[in-house]
């Protein structure tokens, strides 16, 4: 008997999520994790470090409720959006009995979180234009307790049709929780489904401070949902989920003055995205630049592996999507500073 064989069988078979940091690389330009290219500057108060944190940091809850336009009863603060995903699976799915459903190509943590919890996964691939295949989803809802969709979708960058999300909510009513992952919604706020919360008690929305707020290192996310759903998740969440320093910085980030700064910087980044998309389109190595509503672009290359490897060797770290369903020869590029974007274009231009 070894330590490994003592572990649960599903954990022994688990392929862990390959985060951008885990994949490593000796980069000088990091455009593989959809992080904001520069760090904000906040000052830690240093108060109450000798005390355990609040179960839910009330000033952060109130500040995010104000920002999102919901009641504090609709907000649960989590350790990044990923904890929200895990919480929902652990709360609603019986291991080895219930399933989640998601639609690849999409964010990899839905599958990993389910597998870690011993919960089954069902997949219904997106259509050729990366939209929901509603008839097939409807045919696969048996034993499904949670449906995950991502809009803007990672890694494709496109928005899902709100009419399709509405249809999904209707066909799952009384059967399953629908989770809409809005990690990138600050780049297209008009596309949020937050106004649907009042009419659909089985809707949950994942949010984060990791993307437009430039606080990926903070690990602060949110679940937005109706009070009954929030109350159930609150039974499962760890007693002290958000460290005092994280709550301190999150509260500062959600002050009106900083929100205005985030919105201005977001416009600058969207300008960089537009420039990068146009510059990539004229390169002979690039076959297609997909439309994006997020802070990254998905491109299809003649030889994606060659482009990825050539830039990796130059210290420009992108995200290879070649093994992702329907994304052969594709690469995801985080939109960085204008200087970083220019270096990416010049480097791809030199690939033979």
From Swiss-Prot:
GO terms for biological process: L-histidine biosynthetic process. The modification N6-(pyridoxal phosphate)lysine is found at residue 211. The keyword ATP-binding does not apply. It holds the Pfam family Aminotran_1_2. It catalyses: L-histidinol phosphate + 2-oxoglutarate = 3-(imidazol-4-yl)-2-oxopropyl phosphate + L-glutamate. Pathway: Amino-acid biosynthesis; L-histidine biosynthesis; L-histidine from 5-phospho-alpha-D-ribose 1-diphosphate: step 7/9. Keywords: Amino-acid biosynthesis, Aminotransferase, Histidine biosynthesis, Pyridoxal phosphate, Transferase. Its cofactor is pyridoxal 5'-phosphate. It is an enzyme of class 2 (transferase). GO terms for molecular function: histidinol-phosphate transaminase activity; pyridoxal phosphate binding. The keyword Transferase applies. CDD domains: AAT_like (cd00609). Its EC number is 2.6.1.9. Belongs to the class-II pyridoxal-phosphate-dependent aminotransferase family. Histidinol-phosphate aminotransferase subfamily. Homodimer. This is Histidinol-phosphate aminotransferase. It comes from Haemophilus influenzae (strain PittEE). The gene is hisC.
